[in-house]
């Protein structure tokens, strides 16, 4: 069986969706006799002037890149039809042009397809009314072309249940590479919060600065590290926001750190903070917990579930910063007494997200789309 993953951004782009595709494809190929390939766009959205190689091998995976026109919100790339010609099954990632176009052209290409939702297109409030109309019409219609719609979180499952029949909807929560940062967090209690991920308004970074400002009135030892890559906030934007709040001595910025550099930053921190407005799943939070970082998270459904099930960390309302700072300070005081136990429990909880436990469910869906039984040895 040959599975071709179609995703708008992949290596060298870094992000949650890219990480999911890499791990599904890598685990599948490493543990079966199947062939797995990636089809993606030939430019990274954050550096559109640099055209990438048409073909590349990355971590043993064959990548084919195709050109596009239009915006990063809805990049138009009809040449995807040629790129999937050799596939037995096509696995789409995200609800975007590829999703709509491959559904529309299914009578031409005839490929069995599954799609993973990755939060749909509701990550920001941008054009929210138009998005709802699109979702209820075009997204609903396009879904009919897919053998399975795979919701990547319970939150997505609830959302897509509005437009997809229950018989064709499955929830398969993302796995996470829990070995990558395992145990890298600080081993002694302290007052350092770490955020890592995209520098985006959606991620609540300005509110995170306000939380730090409020926390400092309760304990002057608090520090914040913001690591990641520029998105709709750049380094100048963040430095300006930091200076406006007088936090220059309390915030460290690390732009585009390597994995090794991020591990070094984790070793300085006790807490992971993310005040996102929306997450399909929240991979970074799980990665942080695998490092032993205690989570400080916004009150969105995937984060509430993570904190509730793990029994670790604290959920805060980013619109009530003073109350949030009280909760964070109380958490830190409690952690002074039992930090090692909290750290250990946090790491133990996320072991369930290991990709080894997840990839078999995807392979089951590929076989279901093909109408072929899966043999016991499909995953070793």
Swiss-Prot record:
It catalyses: beta-D-Glc-(1->4)-alpha-D-Glc-di-trans,octa-cis-undecaprenyl diphosphate + GDP-alpha-D-mannose = alpha-D-Man-(1->3)-beta-D-Glc-(1->4)-alpha-D-Glc-1-di-trans,octa-cis-undecaprenyl diphosphate + GDP + H(+). One of its GO terms (molecular function) is glycosyltransferase activity. The keyword RNA-binding does not apply. InterPro entries: Glyco_trans_1, Glyco_trans_4-like_N, Glycosyltransferase_grp1. It is an enzyme of class 2 (transferase). Gene3D superfamilies: Glycogen Phosphorylase B. Its EC number is 2.4.1.252. CDD domains: GT4_PimA-like. Keywords: Exopolysaccharide synthesis, Glycosyltransferase, Transferase, Virulence. GO terms for biological process: polysaccharide biosynthetic process. The keyword Transferase applies. Involved in the biosynthesis of the exopolysaccharide xanthan, a polymer that is comprised of repeating pentasaccharide units with the structure of a beta-(1,4)-linked D-glucose backbone with trisaccharide side chains composed of mannose-beta-(1,4)-glucuronic acid-beta-(1,2)-mannose attached to alternate glucose residues in the backbone by alpha-(1,3) linkages. Belongs to the glycosyltransferase group 1 family. Glycosyltransferase 4 subfamily. This is GDP-mannose:cellobiosyl-diphosphopolyprenol alpha-mannosyltransferase. It comes from Xanthomonas campestris. The lineage of its organism: Bacteria, Pseudomonadati, Pseudomonadota, Gammaproteobacteria, Lysobacterales.
């Amino acid at each position: 069986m040959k599975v071709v993953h179609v995703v708008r951004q992949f290596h060298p782009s870094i992000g949650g969706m890219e990480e999911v595709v890499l791990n599904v494809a890598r685990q599948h190929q490493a543990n079966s006799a199947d062939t797995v390939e990636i089809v993606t766009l030939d430019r990274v959205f954050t550096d559109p002037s640099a055209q990438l190689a048409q073909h590349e091998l990355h971590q043993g995976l064959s990548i084919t890149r195709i050109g596009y026109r239009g915006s990063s919100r809805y990049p138009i790339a009809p040449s995807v039809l040629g790129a999937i010609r050799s596939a037995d099954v096509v696995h789409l990632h995200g609800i975007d042009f590829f999703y709509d176009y491959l559904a529309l052209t299914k009578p031409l290409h005839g490929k069995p397809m599954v799609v993973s939702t990755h939060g749909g297109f509701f990550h920001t409030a941008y054009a929210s009314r138009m998005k709802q109309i699109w979702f209820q019409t075009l997204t609903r219609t396009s879904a009919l072309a897919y053998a399975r719609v795979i919701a990547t979180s319970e939150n997505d499952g609830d959302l897509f249940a509005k437009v997809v029949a229950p018989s064709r909807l499955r929830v398969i929560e993302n796995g996470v590479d829990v070995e990558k940062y395992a145990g890298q967090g600080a081993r002694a209690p302290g007052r350092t919060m770490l955020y890592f991920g995209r520098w985006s308004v959606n991620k609540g970074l300005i509110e995170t600065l306000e939380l730090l400002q409020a926390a400092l009135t309760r304990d002057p030892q608090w520090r914040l590290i913001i690591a990641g890559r520029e998105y709709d906030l750049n380094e100048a934007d963040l430095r300006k926001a930091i200076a406006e709040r007088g936090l220059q001595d309390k915030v460290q910025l690390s732009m585009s750190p390597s994995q090794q550099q991020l591990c070094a930053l984790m070793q300085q921190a006790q807490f992971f903070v993310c005040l996102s407005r929306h997450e399909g799943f929240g991979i970074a939070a799980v990665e942080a917990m695998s490092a032993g970082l205690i989570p400080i998270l916004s009150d969105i459904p995937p984060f509430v579930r993570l904190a509730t099930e793990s029994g670790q960390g604290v959920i805060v309302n980013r619109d009530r910063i003073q109350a949030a700072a009280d909760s964070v300070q109380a958490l830190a005081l409690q952690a002074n007494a039992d930090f090692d136990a909290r750290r250990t429990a946090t790491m133990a909880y996320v072991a369930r997200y290991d990709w080894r436990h997840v990839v078999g469910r995807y392979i089951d869906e590929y076989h279901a789309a093909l109408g072929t039984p899966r043999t016991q040895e499909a995953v070793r």
